């Protein structure tokens, strides 16, 4: 199994169509051969994780699928439909090397033992306890500033299944060591981990590397 991530920067005139796609395409994707997990995603700058951070003209999809069915996915009506309304497209084919936690009650990624020393992608996501959203938002800025200033970061964006309460990041790194430096040695992030444990912000969370 592999994980495929798509992001589309759409033309503004097609925003109503994109919203319709978000409402109905998950079911169409789940019916495709070889697909075991689907999430349609909104995106943002990844600076505040509040609704004002959202970018209504950039959307994404994350799909776990058997590698032999990848061509069928790329040629599906869903993916071709998004490509038609997009002015920019991005696709990454990912092989999971580690995952901790759950996503919608599932472990969605088929982890492989790989001897890999190249670039790394990371996906983090969490379901925030509803009554703790405001406290969480106040705590986020130092972490996001630290993330975007991190040595070895190639790019990072915010991702989410909903504007409030279901938040995450997709980031690309030059190496696993750069990612570990941010995650476990950066002061802002380690303080956020401690605060998460103390305040129990999340009802569910996941951290994965590819």
Each predicted region: which residue ranges?
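Alpha-helix boundary/capping residues
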Residues: 76-78, 186, 196
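Signature tryptophan residues that serve as conserved aromatic anchors
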Residues: 64-65, 173
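Short S/T/G/P-rich N-terminal loop/turn motif that feeds into the first structured element of a domain
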Residues: 1-58, 67-73, 84-168, 177-185, ...
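A common structural junction motif
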Residues: 77-87, 189-191
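Extended hydrophobic/aromatic segments used for targeting, binding, or gating
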Residues: 181, 188-204
